């Protein structure tokens, strides 16, 4: 039997590389990575604010000393607020959704929110005409769309995630099937529309901050703040859930209730963003993918702020470049979706497997 005399320091060998000053028991592997995180985050926020300032005052047709300058800026502030809402909703929901599914290439769009939004808009034009779609606005119509999308997701979760044989992968599969079916029905109805009705509908189906009505903000902003705080407070559980069901269960996390709780919060954020701005399929994926690379940590307390900063910068810089550099007044979301789709295909082709 071999015994060690721990009273004699010469008999104990300590690996000094594990206890140097550059390493610490935190979300980052070293203090250098922590400093890098904060530098990147502050830089992204500063660039986002600079782009926002450019959108507000650059190329403003009204002089600053004119009484009409403030009203013009106020109208532009509405677009900035809509960009912040889109960044919060898509960044938080996509990162949380990818964590509970343990898959970095899928997005909450698989649950059919955008397909349902498209079906609601298309059926309104198809059955009641373009005038009904134009009049389909106000707080009542907005809340109706949000409630319908959240209600559909709750039915999906309660049906496929409850019980002994609840399965997250089955829920995703059913969500894809429902989304595909709704898209097929919407496409069929759009083919039967008159050209003028189709043009009006198509403008609604492209995601744009110009669709945002400031009358919705007093309802939307408090809802988003509450949900964002709840998701951020859920960060430690998401850290464990991202390791998989078996590991999360072994750590004492109630897997099924935690997943359903997260999915409900994701559904609320996605429903609000889709009803307010419109569909943005690959925007959340683009933001989440870049945030993982920039944050260099698996701690959601740090991933969420980085994702929001990147999402806000993408939105503000894209609109600034398209409006004031390229002078293209088209739908900026198409460009964002294009880059998001290219990155998605690149990652899929590089991994060769989902």
From Swiss-Prot:
Bilayer disposition of the protein: Multi-pass membrane protein
Broad class of the protein's primary localization: membrane
GO BP term (any one): siderophore-dependent iron import into cell
Protein keywords: Cell membrane, Ion transport, Iron, Iron transport, Membrane, Transmembrane, Transmembrane helix, Transport
Membrane as UniProt keyword: yes
Record-annotated membrane-spanning stretches: 37-57, 77-97, 116-136, 141-161, 168-188, 214-234, 259-279, 302-322, 329-349
Compartment(s): Cell membrane
Gene Ontology molecular function, alphabetical: transmembrane transporter activity
Gene3D superfamilies attached to this UniProt entry: ABC transporter involved in vitamin B12 uptake, BtuC
Disruption phenotype: A mutant lacking both fpuB and fatCD permeases is incapable of using petrobactin as an iron source and exhibits attenuated virulence in a murine model of inhalational anthrax infection.
InterPro entries, per database record: ABC_BtuC-like, ABC_transptr_permease_BtuC
A Pfam family hit: FecCD
GO cellular component entries: plasma membrane
Known function: Part of an ABC transporter complex involved in ferric-petrobactin uptake. Probably responsible for the translocation of the substrate across the membrane.
Assembly and oligomerization: The complex is composed of two ATP-binding proteins (FatE), two transmembrane proteins (FatC and FatD) and a solute-binding protein (FpuA).
Family statement: Belongs to the binding-protein-dependent transport system permease family. FecCD subfamily.
Name recorded for this polypeptide: Petrobactin import system permease protein FatC
